[in-house]
């Protein structure tokens, strides 16, 4: 199941948390461009919206995640280093991403076949492990980062509840 291009909220689900329980931490761009993507405990009616768009040039289930901007400035996108393990996800525009060697495409796939709205956001893949977007405490604030998860059966993969904003 793929996404239609559009505005979405992106809420982190802690391990064992069902998606239908309200609250939680929503991915945020409040710190601005060239900073790590953080999270805030705001509800689905907040102004934290992301434009998720297909990026078929990069392959199946590949997307870009772009911040919503009300001004005329160039928006930032979720960007990840292609060779760093465990690093933060930054909010870079395409020019900055290319200068730093970061990648702005993400594989977003359903976490379960029978549960709507719950997804895994995959970054880098290498022999033995895959990096997944997750949330951690860094410098006193929640930060989106790349969590390496070994490729073995029954390992928990971080999940996100992604819902369309009308």
Swiss-Prot record:
Keywords: Protease inhibitor, Thiol protease inhibitor. GO terms for molecular function: cysteine-type endopeptidase inhibitor activity. Gene3D superfamilies: 2.80.10.50. Disulfide bonds: none annotated. It comes from the Eukaryota. The keyword Ribonucleoprotein does not apply. Residues 20-39 are annotated as: Disordered. The keyword Signal does not apply. Inhibits papain and cysteine cathepsin endopeptidases, and also inhibits cathepsins B and H, which exhibit both exopeptidase and endopeptidase activities. Belongs to the protease inhibitor I85 family. This is Macrocypin-5a.
């Amino acid at each position: 199941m793929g996404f239609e291009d559009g505005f979405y909220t992106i809420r982190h689900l802690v391990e064992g948390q069902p998606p239908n329980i309200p609250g939680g931490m929503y991915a945020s761009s409040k710190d601005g461009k060239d900073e790590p993507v953080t999270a805030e405990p705001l509800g689905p009616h907040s102004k934290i919206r992301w434009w998720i768009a297909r990026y078929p040039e990069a392959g199946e289930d590949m997307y870009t995640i772009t911040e919503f901007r009300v001004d005329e400035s160039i928006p930032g996108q979720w960007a990840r280093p292609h060779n760093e393990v465990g690093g933060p996800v930054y909010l870079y525009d395409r020019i900055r991403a290319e200068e730093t060697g970061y990648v702005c495409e993400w594989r977003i796939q359903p976490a379960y076949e029978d549960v709507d709205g719950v997804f895994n956001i995959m970054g880098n893949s290498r022999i033995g492990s895959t990096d997944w977007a997750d949330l951690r405490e860094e410098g006193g604030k929640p930060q989106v980062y790349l969590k390496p998860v070994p490729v073995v059966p029954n390992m928990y993969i971080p999940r996100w509840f992604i819902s369309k904003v009308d």
